A protein has these predicted regions:
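Short, well-ordered coil/turn segments that N-cap beta-strands
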Residues: 4-8, 43-45, 70-78, 97-99, ...
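Glycine-rich, proline-tolerant flexible connector loops at the mouths of alpha/beta enzymes
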Residues: 22, 43-69, 103-118, 145-153
Length: 156
């Protein structure tokens, strides 16, 4: 979307985050139809379609969408949420045919200490390891900083 000469990038997470809503579960064909509508008719710039390593069925849905998106020239707009687990999420995404990893990381010392039981430095090393591996496999990487605003407030 262009607004006064500036481009605003629209990202939709319905196929990943929407499925976390109680009682919501999309079939693979529903996911495909939603992906096609969002990319072709709505024209979203980015579409996060799944979380890595959820299930074999989810991987098959990602493969189907990635295959279709590749044929339509949309593959660089199809993204999958992954985790700081070095090779596991990266390989799952790569094997699914997707080429963009949205890496979920911790954005606060509190989350590092209390959820991961790691220091900021240890988590940063995990992030680097995962990003370097993803790039070596040819994936583009976006980084999500979970709880960043609280982390910044608590320790700018």
């Amino acid at each position: 979307m262009d607004l006064a000469g500036e481009h605003i990038s629209l990202m939709d997470t319905t196929l990943r985050d929407g499925e976390q809503t109680q009682g919501v579960s999309f079939t693979p064909s529903e996911k495909m139809n939603i992906a096609k509508a969002l990319l072709q008719r709505v024209g979203v710039d980015r579409l996060e379609i799944a979380s890595a390593r959820i299930s074999q069925g989810e991987q098959e849905a990602v493969q189907n969408i990635a295959d279709w998106a590749s044929g339509q020239g949309f593959l660089d707009r199809v993204e999958v949420l992954g985790f700081c687990d070095h090779k596991r999420s990266v390989d799952w995404i790569f094997d699914s045919g997707a080429r963009v990893l949205n890496l979920l990381t911790k954005g606060s010392e509190n989350h590092c200490k209390n959820q991961l039981r790691k220091t900021l430095e240890e988590h940063a090393a995990d992030i680097r390891l995962t990003v370097e591996y993803a790039q070596s496999r040819g994936l583009k990487v976006n980084i999500y900083l979970e709880d960043w605003s609280n982390g910044y407030r608590d320790k700018p």
